[in-house]
């Protein structure tokens, strides 16, 4: 069996969890469902150890891999933004006995997944109806998603090929759009100095917003986790409800700015671990109002679809799409 016909080990590595699967890149639905596993990254000293453990658990071997990591990839090295792992591509490949290993940014993988998503993998959160593009159609998409941090990327489709945009856009400065948000920025600046979008739009960001909302109300916020904030909001707690409202509005404003920055008129995909959990809030909040409220471009923005990705393993799917694209670039393979 040739290397290109063997399953590829794909991974989606975040600051909290590591997900692995085998993928058959010849298929439109490449993930082998019975091979998908999730592990806590804190349980392993390195990515190589986690990958080797996974292969042992499923009783499989692989000679190639595509690992999507939540951090910047710089040549041979990647650093997980919210975890102390420092990953060397060459050392990890040698540890696993791989002939080929690609390290890509996790939101490059989220972007690549768009090329394999179907209509039932997404839920519309406003804008014109989205129809998956036909092969060869040019498309520009943005991708943004809150989880442990805030990931930002994009995808350009040209001539049947996918070109992901790897960015660290979650770390751009937070631009408040209301007097309340200006006050939130002031409060968070006292703790963090510079305040990035990720300080608000992610799991820990919910807690940060809640603390600021409580401070403005003269209320002790307590020691809460993100899940506590959303649970309190569901039970009618005023500060928690306001926190969710602010979160959704700011998320919409940032997503709209991303569309303008990238020229992503074909749509923005909302991914990350929080998006499915907060879907109802996003659909019944100021998300789209702030998304569309872009001055002279408001009428154009009203047509841009925003789509919540509901596929449970979009990062793995995108890593598989990247592997398939890499195979087309391999020597001796016709484009």
From Swiss-Prot:
The keyword Kinase applies. Its EC number is 2.7.1.2. Belongs to the bacterial glucokinase family. SUPFAM superfamilies: Actin-like ATPase domain. It comes from the Bacteria. Coiled coil: none annotated. The keyword Nucleotide-binding applies. One of its GO terms (biological process) is glycolytic process. One of its GO terms (cellular component) is cytosol. This is Glucokinase. ATP binds at residues 11-16. The lineage of its organism: Bacteria, Pseudomonadati, Pseudomonadota, Gammaproteobacteria, Lysobacterales. HAMAP family: Glucokinase. It catalyses: D-glucose + ATP = D-glucose 6-phosphate + ADP + H(+). GO terms for molecular function: ATP binding; D-glucose binding; glucokinase activity. It is an enzyme of class 2 (transferase). It is found in: Cytoplasm. It holds the Pfam family Glucokinase. Keywords: ATP-binding, Cytoplasm, Glycolysis, Kinase, Nucleotide-binding, Transferase.
